[in-house]
Amino acid sequence: MRHRKSGRQLNRNSSHRQAMFRNMACSIVRHEIIKTTVAKAKELRRVVEPLITLAKVDSVANRRLAFARTRDAEVVGKLFTELGPRFQERPGGYTRILKCGLRTGDKAPMAYIELVGRPEAAEAVEVEAAE
């Protein structure tokens, strides 16, 4: 029985799943938007949002926790210098999932997962409005 088991298996063993979400979390922190399947995007929220919450308080202990979860010093630096201060007043909900159709090969539902309030999105809207 699977009582009280949370999270999706995604047809992977636990170490593969953990490595995949660690890599995806690093990618979304670096690029602030990535394209993936809807199921992976929904699970990725559970990894990324606590990292950003951790980054709101810049301390050595929090940086070490973030590094233990991402294993990437560049990502930890961006979390604590850019993303933590950006989301300081927001009490959660740092990501947005936008569905974008089906994948060509296998018709898997795809989605963009992005960080809310990313600067590129605001600039793109202003450019389109000006045209």
Swiss-Prot record:
Domain of life per record: Bacteria
Classification via PROSITE patterns: RIBOSOMAL_L17
Pfam families: Ribosomal_L17
Keywords of this entry: Ribonucleoprotein, Ribosomal protein
GO CC field: cytosolic large ribosomal subunit
GO molecular function annotations of the record: structural constituent of ribosome
Subunit structure: Part of the 50S ribosomal subunit. Contacts protein L32.
PANTHER family: LARGE RIBOSOMAL SUBUNIT PROTEIN BL17M (PTHR14413:SF16), RIBOSOMAL PROTEIN L17 (PTHR14413)
Protein name: Large ribosomal subunit protein bL17
